[in-house]
Every structure is written in structure tokens, then in C-alpha cells.
Amino acid sequence: VAQQPSASSSCEWTPTEPGVYTVYLDVIDGSAERHLTRKVTVGERYSVESLEVSGDALCGKPVKLQAKVSGDASGLKYKFVWEKGGWAKWGVAQQPSASSSCEWTPTEPGVYTVYLDVIDGSAERHLTRKVTVEGTPIMGSLQTSVDAMVNLYESTGHTYPSDEFISKGAPTIRDFCSLIVEAAVSEGVRPEVVFAQAMLETGWLQFGGSVKPNQCNFAGLGAVNQQSGGARFDDVYQGLLAQVQHLKGYATGAALNNACVDPRYEVLQSKGFLGVAPYLEDLNGRWAVPGDTYGQNIARIISLIG
């Protein structure tokens, strides 16, 4: 009943659902009544138009998830959920909130499904969208400079071990970074990837683990535990080239451009690992075990290079 019998010839009525209604009017005159009816079509209060994703979908970079709603959106709440690999991995980007957008930072490459729940009291409407997230590529051209790598190293406050490397072809950090670029470019690997991995593996060239500076092993090649010192190389360039070749082996099945100096390259070949990790994030659990965030940690250092 929109209005009980009243002297007022009008009233307000608030429909709660979309659809076709029949409205009945009774005009009462004592014991006599007259009647009218009218069909009223009520549209939806709001409509969920789309789930939009803005920004580059890259590992470690925030993207914006936005619910597009037309009509009266007052009182609505929005929940965003993501999953990858058939719910093998999933998470909540935003719990139910009045905000129709949120930021989500994917941590791994691959195809994700993003779920949007638009909540209106006890009612919900849903949308899904596939999002392909690109990782941090290992192969590629130089995207920074020797100066930028040197500046980052010096900003950390670490002292470059000149005494260790002066006889190995890299008396200064600038020489070291120049050799990184030379070795990396020769095999088509991004120099900043090599720099960042070397800094992560050696603690900014301070070492301290089973690998010693005079081994010129900047990526822990062959150092499978704390007791094993791993591979040994004649000079800094050879050690960096071995690291570059191991990265290339993981990233692509393409042949090496130089004579192989990586003692572990044949392991990648024999186990069918060539080309299984085109992105840094794919190295998780491969180069380092368990290494759940190994690639992300390298990418984080890359992001610090100016």
C-alpha cells in the first residue's frame, strides 16, 4: 500500500526492484468507489558497465582497478579479488568499500582473473576480467647507464673492494660496471639485470658467504650451499660473462654468442631448462631455492637505478 485512504490526492512511492508494476487507484466517496489502474515500468537504479584496468600490467607495478557504474550508485560497495592458475594463488585487492577503485600490484607474470563484486545491501552483481601481467625481461638492450649504476652503488655507502679486483681487471666500481655492460651486451642480456643480480648475490660486493671475492663469481654459480664456494673465474670479466650466459640460458633457447665460460650452462641444457625463465620473476625457485621472491628482489634493485 503506497497510501491508506486519505484526503490527499497524491503520495510518494519508492519501488525497490526493477520491473513492470501495476498501480491501483481507489477514489472513495462514502460507500461508493471508482477505480483506475496504470502500468509503470521501473528501470534499474544502477547498472554495472565495466571493470577497467589502467596502467601497464607489469610485475611490481601498481595498476588501477576501476568499477564503472551508471545510474544511482549511492550506498554501493565494491570488492576486488584476483586469482591466478585456477585459484592456485589468489588474494583480495580490496575488501568491500565505498570506493569504486583500488590499486593492485601483481608480483608474478602470467594471466590473472580479476573479480569485481558490486554489493547493494544483500544483493550483488559480478564482473570478471582477464589481465595479462608481463614480468621483468632478462633479455634486452641497455635501459640505463654506467653512471647510473655507479651512482646507485656509491649511494649505498659500501666500499668497493679495489684491492680484490685491481689485479682482476676492475680497479674501480666504474670499471666493474663498464665490464657488466660489455659482457651483457655481447649476449643480448640487459646490463641492469646483471648489475642488480650481482649486487643482490654478493651483498653489494661485500661477499661474506661461502663465495670469496677472488673467485670473481658474482652470481653464486655452483655455490649450492654454505660449504660450497662454487665456481672460480680468472678475472672479473670472465665471471660476469659466465653470469650473463647463465641468465641467457634461462631466458632463451638461443645459442650463445661467445665461447661458453659458464660451467653450469650444460646443466641447463641437460635438464631442458633453456628458455624456461624469460622474466626475472621466473627465476624464483630455479636460480635460488626456495627463492620465492628472488626475481622480485633483483627487479627492486633495478628500480633504484636512475
Give a label for each model feature:
Residues A2-A7, G91-A98:
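Short beta-strand segments within Ig-like beta-sandwich modules, predominantly Fibronectin type-III
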Residues W13-E17, K84, W104-E108:
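Residue-level recognition of secondary-structure-to-loop junctions
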Residues G30, S70-S74, G121:
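Short glycine/proline-centered coil/turn motifs in the loop regions
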Residues G55-K61:
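Short, solvent-exposed loop/linker segments at the N-terminal edge
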Residues K61-V69:
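A short beta-strand segment in extracellular, disulfide-stabilized domains
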Residues G135-G306:
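Catalytic cores of secreted/periplasmic lytic hydrolases that degrade extracellular macromolecules
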